[in-house]
């Protein structure tokens, strides 16, 4: 089997195989053959559960934004979609852990290395074995699947890291919201009114009672305080009410107003009992409206509508009781 034809050129002497020597030239051939097969296996849909897991993880990455994009946008997607994606990813990761306790790369890589080493050693001895070539192709396909699984595992790890960052951000927001809610609750508790000191009477009852007694009650005498500057260049409201203009507004008779303006003119009358200028009749030379003029004069001096008007009309002398010229003992002397 090792005999060579006569017309063939002599071959160089064989060199012992070492991992770093140039004799391992067939290795790149196997790697170049694995590339199209790897692309073919990645394009096939539904080959195994790992392919579906990879597709699902890619969909999760497209749906869930990263922390940078969420911070730039100012708000994150709906909490429901993030929770669903997070639960879906956790369930898929749990399935992978249950099915494969250990990654295939841990078994495929040593098997591929041993098969490749045996194949290279056989080629170095000019002993080409068909079974080693087929075994190398099988181990190479298994190694490609293991590499694909390793890529999926790395992508899943990146997705888990991104979801953990999103979860930490949401946890921070939830803590801030809980802290703010606690502060608001504390403030609202402090702002609650004290029901013990609160009056049980309603405003409607108070208004109804005030309307009922409004026609029978008045304000206190000194309800309105005297203004601070009472001596102003113009008269105050109370003085204007006591004047003649206020009496005219009330509707007094012009004759009575004339008597108030000049009471002496109507106090002295003629002897024949006829009052001049159309005045009221007289008796015994004394005008009858003398007391009325005195009452109006008292009203002007004490104030219009005062409480002393009734007493003055009933007893004309009671208005002069406070004067020095009136002596109560004169009546007693006359009786004696």
UniProtKB/Swiss-Prot annotation:
Signal peptide: none annotated. Residues 154-192 form a coiled coil. Residues 325-336 have a biased composition (Acidic residues). Keywords: Activator, Coiled coil, Nucleus, Transcription, Transcription regulation. InterPro entries: Mediator_Med4. Its main location: nucleus. It comes from the Eukaryota. It is found in: Nucleus. One of its GO terms (cellular component) is core mediator complex. One of its GO terms (molecular function) is transcription coregulator activity. The keyword Iron-sulfur does not apply. Pfam families: Med4. Residues 1-45, 59-85, 281-336 are annotated as: Disordered. Component of the Mediator complex. Component of the Mediator complex, a coactivator involved in the regulated transcription of nearly all RNA polymerase II-dependent genes. Mediator functions as a bridge to convey information from gene-specific regulatory proteins to the basal RNA polymerase II transcription machinery. Mediator is recruited to promoters by direct interactions with regulatory proteins and serves as a scaffold for the assembly of a functional preinitiation complex with RNA polymerase II and the general transcription factors. This is Mediator of RNA polymerase II transcription subunit 4. The gene is MED4.
């Amino acid at each position: 089997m090792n005999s060579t034809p006569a017309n063939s050129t002599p071959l160089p002497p064989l060199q012992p195989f070492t991992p770093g020597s140039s004799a391992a030239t067939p290795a790149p051939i196997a790697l170049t053959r694995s590339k199209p097969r790897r692309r073919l296996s990645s394009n096939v849909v539904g080959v195994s559960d790992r392919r579906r897991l990879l597709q699902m993880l890619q969909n999760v990455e497209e749906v869930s934004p990263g922390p940078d994009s969420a911070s730039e946008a100012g708000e994150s997607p709906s909490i429901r979609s993030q929770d669903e994606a997070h639960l879906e990813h956790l369930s898929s990761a749990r399935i992978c852990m249950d099915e494969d306790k250990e990654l295939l790369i841990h078994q495929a890589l040593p098997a591929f290395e041993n098969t490749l080493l045996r194949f290279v050693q056989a080629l170095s001895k000019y002993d080409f074995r068909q079974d080693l070539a087929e075994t190398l192709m099988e181990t190479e396909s298994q190694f490609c699947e293991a590499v694909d699984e390793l890529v999926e595992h790395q992508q899943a790890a990146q997705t888990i890291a991104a979801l953990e960052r999103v979860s930490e951000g949401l946890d921070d927001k939830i803590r801030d919201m809980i802290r703010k809610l606690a502060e608001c609750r504390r403030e609202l508790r402090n702002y609650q009114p004290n029901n013990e000191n609160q009056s049980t009477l309603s405003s409607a009852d108070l208004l109804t009672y005030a309307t009922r007694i409004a026609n029978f009650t008045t304000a206190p005498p000194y309800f309105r305080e005297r203004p601070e500057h009472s001596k102003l260049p113009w008269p105050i409201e109370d003085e204007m009410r006591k004047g003649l203009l206020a009496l005219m507004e009330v509707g007094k008779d012009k004759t009575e107003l004339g008597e108030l303006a000049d009471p002496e003119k109507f106090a002295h009358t003629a002897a024949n009992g006829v009052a001049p200028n159309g005045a009221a009749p007289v008796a015994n030379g004394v005008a009858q409206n003398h007391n009325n003029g005195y009452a109006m004069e008292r009203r002007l001096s004490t104030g219009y509508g005062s409480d002393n008007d009734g007493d003055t009309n009933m007893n004309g002398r009671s208005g002069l009781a406070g004067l020095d010229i009136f002596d109560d003992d004169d009546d007693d002397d006359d009786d004696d």
